[in-house]
Amino acid sequence: MPKLEQRFDYVKIGLASPDRIRLWGERTLPNGQVVGEVTKPETINYRTLKPEMDGLFCERIFGPAKDWECHCGKYKRVRHRGIVCERCGVEVTESRVRRHRMGYIKLAAPVTHVWYLKGIPSYMATLLDMPLRDVEQIVYFNAYVVLNPGNHESLTYKQLLSEDQWIEIEDQIYSEDSQLVDIEVGIGAEAVQRLLQDLELETEAEALRSEIDVSKGQKRAKLIKRLRVIDNFIATGSRPDWMVLTVIPVIPPDLRPMVQLDGGRFATSDLNDLYRRVINRNNRLARLQEILAPEIIVRNEKRMLQEAVDALIDNGRRGRTVVGANNRPLKSLSDIIEGKQGRFRQNLLGKRVDYSGRSVIVVGPKLKMHQCGLPREMAIELFQPFVIHRLIRQGLVNNIKAAKRLIQRNDPIIWEVLEEVIDGHPVLLNRAPTLHRLGIQAFEPILVDGRAIQLHPLVCPAFNADFDGDQMAVHVPLSIESQAEARLLMLASNNILSPATGKPIVTPSQDMVLGCYYLTAENPKSQQGEGTYFASMNDVVMAYEQGQVELHAFIWVRYDGEVEDDDKGEPEIQTSGDGLVTHLYPSKRLRFDQDGKLISQYIRTTPGRIIYNKTIQESLAI
């Protein structure tokens, strides 16, 4: 099958005419036979397990079920490419054509498109300038509508009539002395189609513009709304009566598959059930029309056909929802398209990409701000091509297959090579929803055990992340350019300020604030090690780690730097035998020699405050 490449700027969705729907599904075979219309509700033959002809999986309409093989088996193999079998009429080609070849169902009676009837706003009701309730009554055979009042004095165009009113008028028309002529009334989608066909869009638009100029308030707003719809129909070249369907497209069979399960049973797409309902009711209606069945029976069948098509297009939009086994609502065409799991958002706007992973995030308090903890299991998958390349380059293996075998065996050498590979190779972390540019940032990966991604707590506000089960995605930039860009522009430590406000977005919160408070808090109660003197801050930390002092105990530590304090009062002065003078303040001790020169300074603090101060000094490299 030749590949067709065509560049386009955008996709536009509009109304399809009946001719265009036929064109999608109709094909002419070399023998002149036109195929494309699905006329039977059958799917596959339960004995041969082959698709039924003219059914929902017909090979003549949609293409062969097996590559290069016709339905009857006369032609097999690729050498018969392009031949159409004289016996079964199936073209010998690839089976993948069943993913794009369409069919169609020719309806025995027109039906309205439920989107245009029941949508908000209802375009059908807006165009006809009628209340939606009235249009619904016509469509679902609850009321007649006057299509042509003729010479009847009390009838008006588009007037609704009940069954009794119409019988009364009918009696008047067919009475012997009747003068009434040209009176036409209709019911169902056919009547709505006729009303839409009678609309002259250009004339209607001109009349509306004139009326808008002299109107005010709510009436003017209503007229503008109607004019906007009419202008859109004119601009797109669509006809209003195309909102009433006479032909329904049947989507390709591989997009609504039927799969055989282990026990011999079949699992099928809900669409097949919905299409089957439409075909059954359509065939029944055609048969009733052929045998000239009573009008009431035909009308009931038309209503049922309308409901079947409604369920196919948008199940549950109007009337009772069609359910399958276990009372589960069947998924209609609309359900497949719309929502988060729909075709657009799931498959077209968002796709799965290579070199990416996803896992739950947990806090990594020992990480630096530009680092993230990447699980080994995930890292070896993401960086596998790089690891294989390095293994071959270092001569540890000879080929890719041997390298993969080494990785599968979890050989210890793999982790050493992986450490070398990820060193200096940033990864991108993204948390959905990405509402601003800081929703995706670069980090240097650090290999960790477990299966959770570790994240520095300071970058949480930028991602709007917390650790109650949030998940994040990891992406690996492959090219040198993308790695450089990630390092220079996207590294977390380079994104301190919010792009929206210019204020710092990296601010400590919750656990960090509580931790800082706990470290620096004072406890007036007596604690272990209280009043002890230490020669340096390192001695204090060592004593705390050995359990000799508690975190909040008041201790004295020698400190030679400047100290800001509130000791304004006069100190208590002590003099030792060797002539040294000590000034005693509430929060510090100053010792001077005989010449008044400061020898040492001890300050009153807690191990917690020393640890806090020491950590900040080390991180700032003071």
Swiss-Prot record:
GO terms for molecular function: DNA binding; DNA-directed RNA polymerase activity; magnesium ion binding; zinc ion binding. InterPro entries: DNA-dir_RpoC1_gamma, DNA-dir_RpoC_beta_prime, RNA_pol_asu, RNA_pol_N, RNA_pol_Rpb1_1, RNA_pol_Rpb1_3, RNA_pol_Rpb1_3_sf, RNA_pol_Rpb1_clamp_domain. Keywords: DNA-directed RNA polymerase, Magnesium, Metal-binding, Nucleotidyltransferase, Transcription, Transferase, Zinc. GO terms for cellular component: DNA-directed RNA polymerase complex. Its EC number is 2.7.7.6. Its cofactor is Mg(2+); Zn(2+). Mg(2+) binds at residues 466, 468, 470. Pfam families: RNA_pol_Rpb1_1 (PF04997), RNA_pol_Rpb1_2 (PF00623), RNA_pol_Rpb1_3 (PF04983). Zn(2+) binds at residues 70, 72, 85, 88. It catalyses: RNA(n) + a ribonucleoside 5'-triphosphate = RNA(n+1) + diphosphate. Binds 1 Mg(2+) ion per subunit. Binds 1 Zn(2+) ion per subunit. One of its GO terms (biological process) is DNA-templated transcription. HAMAP family: RNApol_bact_RpoC1 (MF_01323). Belongs to the RNA polymerase beta' chain family. RpoC1 subfamily. DNA-dependent RNA polymerase catalyzes the transcription of DNA into RNA using the four ribonucleoside triphosphates as substrates. NCBIfam families: PRK02625.1, rpoC1_cyan. In cyanobacteria the RNAP catalytic core is composed of 2 alpha, 1 beta, 1 beta', 1 gamma and 1 omega subunit. When a sigma factor is associated with the core the holoenzyme is formed, which can initiate transcription. This is DNA-directed RNA polymerase subunit gamma. It comes from Cyanothece sp. (strain PCC 7425 / ATCC 29141).
